[in-house]
């Protein structure tokens, strides 16, 4: 089995395609179950965020994974990136460290990678290969963020959106802000807004208790999601980030809200994938809509300022990838030796138990020992004998040469080490 990662992100695919490729809620466990049912796949994990959808798998080949993704979201194959083995390891290390994020060094992605691992493990989709990889990923990401400043004062998508709102409304402290959702992104937005002060903070969520908790922490007012349309006209600024599959804020609703506001401008930030706000809202005069793709341009300055720390983190990742691959290769090299030893031990135990039973039954010791030695020799030598016979028939020189080194003609003979060629210099004496 080969380690593969296939995915798309904010750099390779537009937001509408990322919407279709996303896995949310109950769709994620069902997708993992579907993946594990593929005969070519032994392990799988899915990472799905607003900016990326990635499939990590131990599989025979990549084509079956591409086909599976195409079934989930037709038309995405042209936007996919694909890595295997060491490059797949490097990719996951970079993702978890925040080096592949829209906002360089953002901290949320590590938690999202941990969530992907936990869900895959809880639903039986992980084996020893991917589990080991994810565990090492958490260690590498922690070290990179501790030893460098790549995660220092990170600028998140939420904080970038709040900053844009502050720049657009010179007196944001006199404005009413509506937050839709109560997840991590909205929590961050609420935190930044409460630090900068707003006149009124409304928080609408499907689960009212979650909105009430967030409102109590930041001095806001909680609303059930069913009251969203009624309060939309009150909002000067709207931030939305939910896991809804369909838009929660429509063009018609915003148009009605603008009329009620007497065309007073409204600023909307759609931080969700799939999108929470209909894209056509941006066509309305006095409505200004930003999506996560728009925010990428706003965070580019931050990305440049953190490049030096990122380079240091990249060096740590390069070293850790090399060490991880070396460990895997050593484990792979040891596997045949372990199988050989296990075969020898099980054969010995089986035949020894049989010999002891024969002695217990009164069979002569010499006869039992003779049979034991004969059976042990035949049982242990049968697999290599059969393999060498096939090698000779198929002219497999590599295997027969290896056998010559393993089984020299003279008992006790040790093959000399392979000599290092002598390189003559230009001024060396010519051979006589």
From Swiss-Prot:
The organism's place on the tree of life at top rank: Bacteria
Sequence positions that bind NADP(+): 181-186
Positions annotated as active site in the UniProt record: 50
Gene designation per UniProt: hemA
Further remarks about this protein from its record: During catalysis, the active site Cys acts as a nucleophile attacking the alpha-carbonyl group of tRNA-bound glutamate with the formation of a thioester intermediate between enzyme and glutamate, and the concomitant release of tRNA(Glu). The thioester intermediate is finally reduced by direct hydride transfer from NADPH, to form the product GSA.
Domain-related comment: Possesses an unusual extended V-shaped dimeric structure with each monomer consisting of three distinct domains arranged along a curved 'spinal' alpha-helix. The N-terminal catalytic domain specifically recognizes the glutamate moiety of the substrate. The second domain is the NADPH-binding domain, and the third C-terminal domain is responsible for dimerization.
Primary role: Catalyzes the NADPH-dependent reduction of glutamyl-tRNA(Glu) to glutamate 1-semialdehyde (GSA).
Cystine connections: none
Site (Important for activity): 91
Pathway in which the depicted protein is active: Porphyrin-containing compound metabolism; protoporphyrin-IX biosynthesis; 5-aminolevulinate from L-glutamyl-tRNA(Glu): step 1/2
Enzyme Commission number, as recorded: 1.2.1.70
Keywords: NADP, Oxidoreductase, Porphyrin biosynthesis
Reactions catalysed, as given in the entry: (S)-4-amino-5-oxopentanoate + tRNA(Glu) + NADP(+) = L-glutamyl-tRNA(Glu) + NADPH + H(+)
SUBUNIT field: Homodimer.
Name recorded for this polypeptide: Glutamyl-tRNA reductase
Source organism: Xanthomonas oryzae pv. oryzae (strain KACC10331 / KXO85)
InterPro entries per UniProt: 4pyrrol_synth_GluRdtase, 4pyrrol_synth_GluRdtase_dimer, 4pyrrol_synth_GluRdtase_N, GluRdtase_CS, GluRdtase_dimer_dom_sf, GluRdtase_N_sf, NAD(P)-bd_dom_sf, Shikm_DH/Glu-tRNA_Rdtase
Enzyme's top EC category: oxidoreductase
MF (Gene Ontology): glutamyl-tRNA reductase activity; NADP binding
